């Protein structure tokens, strides 16, 4: 299960999955298609495990944990489509535990916790409560209503807690698209609601809890679709090979994983919130991400299974039915994406903070002292102080950095907010590699001048016609006395004109296999017979360059690593590059805030634009959450997850999506020079899905290295 990071949560997820497998939950779910399935055994066994009360205080019969533990179990239930009223019951209990007085909590929470009471939750508008406590109207599509004894329903800004047999209240059951769900309409005709059954001002909290817990279940269903499709394409053969080797199939599966990771990160963040009264934005982001992922993975699961996925006997359509039902329930009356925009306008666009362990205090004291000392220095001395103290590159090994672990890095990031720290860019990726694989003499000669800003490096990997294939090296070197003669051409070299050195892949053994026979060399770009020609980009800038080598001499002392093992060095450099980009560099200045301003100032109407802006804002927030989950994994030693690979790809495409929409909202102002803050980032963002590995190649990497799909046998 994807939500769990800590060992305790992983163990809980494993127990939940094993229980549902033993109870044949998915088989019971299928039985609901043709007849009323017997779900009582599954419900009873689930209640016996105490999961219904994971989030309920101990004094009311619960375990006293919280939403993080509950969402782990809900993810497992969604994975197996468990046809029990777990979601509405725990949501009702969550609302009561947070917003109800002790009298109501004592009356209902013990029964909701042990499973003797079933709860229902309705968030759709339609119920009206007058000042005398008379309830009229209807709440349609109330989850769990036909089976429930306690109804928790939104009525305006309030929540009413009703017995299902209250005079004036009727429940009409519906046989819906998702037969594993019990859904009904609750109608009230002059129903008298006692004052102690009205939770004043609790509607927003009820909606937020409903969204968070439903998102967790949706993430589980989406993961099941990915797993099923992945297993199928690995074994299903067409045209003499597994269909999972085809790039189009790989990209579908990579997109499924990306959507799930966004949903998981957003749900994880919302569930961790300590202040449920301020969780509305995070809950809306979770709901938006999770429903989109659930619907898209369910649809793609059928597509990837081909004809078999369209059959009644296959489970794929059960997940499609669930996905579309969840999407409808979560958008009934209150669109999560619209709420995302509203929260952003109100300055409430925030999620849970990252809680660091006690040992962070010492690092914080040191970093704070460094910042204070830095402020006392003349500007000309500040860079040297950052280098000497290790705060310029704290994650590097000593003597250049501080060998800072995850906790110290996060503390430094927080304490240095607003402090101007020189950005090394590509030179940082290259010199970090030199610190890892260079000789001692090379490290002494090259690294310190870069850190102190005395010279800079570029990366000489890309060649004409090679595209994203960094191993397609044709630049060659022949052995001469004392070194090598290099001939060839590199292209798309960033900032080469301003660099003194370049780290180049050079083929030294033309008879060796593609990834062998390559040697890494440091080339002095001021050497004779090196020619650098700038390439003008669509923005008008000249960042990229062509670099030509005509019998350029490279001494043996400038060979980095062993001769013939340059690909290993290149992989290290590319890895450093991707970590840096995925960690947050390479962004554009145009953000969601600018998009909201354009939306609010647009003269012409843009139907549906508010939801589109909401999607961008939700994605922008979730990118930060992917990085946060990666940081938490590092802090607790949980090992790497897929977040780093996913973040680089999502961020690049996000930059294009946000500027695309910005151009649309700006209209003619964007093309007449009146909105340069939109137009320039729009043009620049075109390169972000190309540089550092194209989005298409990144999807191949995700599908092969993370999902385990086989490589295309035709690729050499």
Residue ranges of model-derived segments:
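Extended, hydrophobic interaction surfaces within ordered domains
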Residues: 226, 239-348, 677
């Amino acid at each position: 299960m994807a939500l769990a990071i800590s060992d305790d949560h992983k163990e809980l997820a494993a127990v939940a999955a094993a229980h549902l497998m033993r109870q044949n939950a998915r088989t019971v779910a299928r039985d609901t298609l043709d007849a009323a399935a017997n779900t009582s055994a599954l419900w009873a066994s689930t209640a016996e495990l105490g999961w219904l009360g994971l989030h309920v205080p101990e004094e009311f019969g619960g375990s006293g944990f919280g939403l993080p533990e509950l969402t782990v179990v809900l993810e497992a239930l969604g994975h197996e489509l468990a046809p029990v009223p777990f979601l509405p019951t725990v949501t009702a209990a969550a609302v009561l535990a947070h917003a109800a007085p002790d009298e109501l909590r004592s009356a209902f929470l013990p029964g909701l916790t042990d499973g003797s009471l079933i709860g229902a939750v309705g968030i759709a508008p339609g119920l009206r409560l007058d000042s005398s406590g008379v309830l009229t109207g209807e709440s349609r599509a109330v989850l769990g209503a036909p089976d429930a004894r306690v109804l928790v329903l939104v009525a305006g800004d309030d929540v009413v807690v009703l017995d299902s047999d209250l005079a004036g209240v009727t429940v009409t059951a519906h046989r819906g698209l998702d037969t594993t769900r019990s859904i009904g309409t609750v109608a009230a005709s002059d129903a008298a609601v006692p004052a102690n059954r009205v939770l004043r001002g609790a509607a927003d909290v009820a909606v937020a809890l409903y969204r968070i817990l439903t998102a967790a279940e949706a993430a589980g269903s989406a993961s099941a679709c990915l797993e099923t499709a992945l297993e199928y394409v690995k074994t299903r053969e067409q045209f003499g090979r597994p269909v999972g080797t085809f790039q189009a199939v790989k990209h579908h599966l990579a997109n499924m994983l990306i959507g799930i990771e966004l949903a998981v990160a957003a749900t994880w963040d919302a569930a961790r919130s300590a202040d449920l009264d301020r969780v509305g934005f995070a809950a809306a982001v979770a709901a938006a991400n999770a429903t989109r992922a659930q619907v898209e993975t369910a649809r793609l699961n059928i597509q990837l299974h081909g004809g078999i996925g369209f059959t009644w006997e296959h489970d794929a359509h059960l997940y499609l039915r669930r996905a579309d039902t969840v999407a409808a329930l979560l958008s009934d009356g209150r669109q999560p994406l619209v709420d995302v925009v509203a929260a952003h306008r109100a300055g409430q666009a925030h999620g849970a903070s990252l809680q660091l362990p006690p040992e962070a205090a010492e690092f914080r004291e040191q970093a704070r002292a460094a910042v204070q000392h830095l402020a006392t220095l003349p500007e000309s001395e500040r860079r040297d102080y950052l280098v000497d103290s290790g705060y310029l590159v704290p994650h590097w090994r000593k003597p250049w950095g501080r060998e800072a672990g995850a906790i110290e890095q996060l503390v430094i990031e927080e304490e240095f907010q607003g402090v101007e720290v020189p950005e090394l860019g590509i030179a940082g990726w290259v010199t970090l590699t030199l610190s890892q694989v260079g000789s001692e003499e090379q490290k002494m000669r090259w690294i310190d001048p870069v850190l102190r800003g005395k010279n800079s490096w570029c990366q000489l990997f890309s060649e004409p016609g090679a595209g994203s294939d960094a191993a397609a090296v044709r630049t060659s070197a022949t052995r001469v006395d004392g070194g090598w003669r290099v001939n060839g051409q590199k292209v798309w070299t960033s900032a080469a004109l301003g660099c003194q050195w370049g780290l180049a892949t050079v083929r030294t053994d033309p008879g060796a296999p593609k990834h062998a026979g390559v040697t890494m060399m440091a080339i002095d770009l001021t050497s004779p017979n090196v020619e650098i020609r700038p390439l003008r980009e669509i923005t008008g800038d000249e960042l990229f360059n062509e670099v030509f080598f005509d019998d350029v001499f490279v001494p043996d002392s400038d060979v980095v690593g062993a001769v013939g093992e340059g690909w290993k060095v290149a992989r290290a450099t590319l890895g450093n590059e991707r970590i840096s980009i995925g960690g947050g560099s390479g962004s554009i200045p145009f953000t969601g805030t600018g998009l909201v301003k354009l939306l609010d100032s647009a003269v012409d109407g843009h139907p549906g634009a508010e939801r589109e802006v909401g999607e961008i804002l939700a994605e922008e927030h979730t990118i930060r959450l992917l990085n946060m989950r990666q940081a938490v994994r590092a802090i607790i030693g949980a090992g790497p997850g897929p977040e780093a690979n996913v973040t680089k790809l999502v961020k690049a495409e996000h930059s294009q999506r946000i500027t695309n929409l910005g151009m649309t909202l700006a209209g003619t102002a964007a093309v007449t020079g009146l909105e340069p803050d939109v137009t320039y980032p729009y043009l620049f963002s075109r390169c972000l899905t190309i540089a550092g590995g194209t989005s298409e190649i990144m999807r191949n990497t995700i599908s092969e290295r993370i999902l385990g799909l086989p490589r295309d046998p035709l690729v050499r």
